[in-house]
Amino acid sequence: MYGYGSLIWRPDFAFEERRLATLRGHHRALCLWSRVNRGTPECPGLVFGLDRGGSCRGVVYRLAGAQVPDYFPALWDREMSTGAYLPRWLGCETEQGVVQALVFVMNRDNPGYVSTLPEDEVVAIIRRAAGRYGPCTDYVVETARALREAGIRDARLDVLARRLMSGPE
C-alpha cells in the first residue's frame, strides 16, 4: 500500500514494514474537494490526491497479511467511497528496489476533482473549511509534519503549512 498524505500519519491498519518510496508519474496535490471529512457542502475543503505528472515521495507499507481481512474493507471504503480515486498496482522505488504497491490515484473525471488553483485561494479555502475529521488546516499541517518526520522533503507543502500556521493574512 502506498501512502502520500494522511495514510502516513493515520494509516488505520496493521503493517509489518514501512519504507520510503518514490512514485513516478504522479504528484501530491490538493486537488480534491472535501465536503464531509475536511469541509461541508456549503464550505468545502481541499484534500490530497495523486494527480498526473511528476513524482511523489511517500511510503509503502507491507501489510500484516493475517489481519488484512479485518481492516482492508474499512481502508477500501476510506479511499474509494466517493469514486475520487482509481486503484492501481504501480511500481514504487525504494532503497531496496522497486516494489508493486496498491496506489489510489486521482480520478480526474470525478466531480470533486480540482485543477490548479492560485495559492492564495487554496490558503483561503483551507483556512475556512472544517468537517467530520476537523479543520482542513490541521489536515494539511499534520501531513507536512508527518512528511518531515519521515524524512520526506516537500518544499511546496512546507511553504503552504507555514502560511497556514502564521495566522490570518
Where in the sequence are the language-model features?
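A glycine-rich, hydrophobic/aromatic-adjacent loop/helix-cap motif
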Residues: 1-169
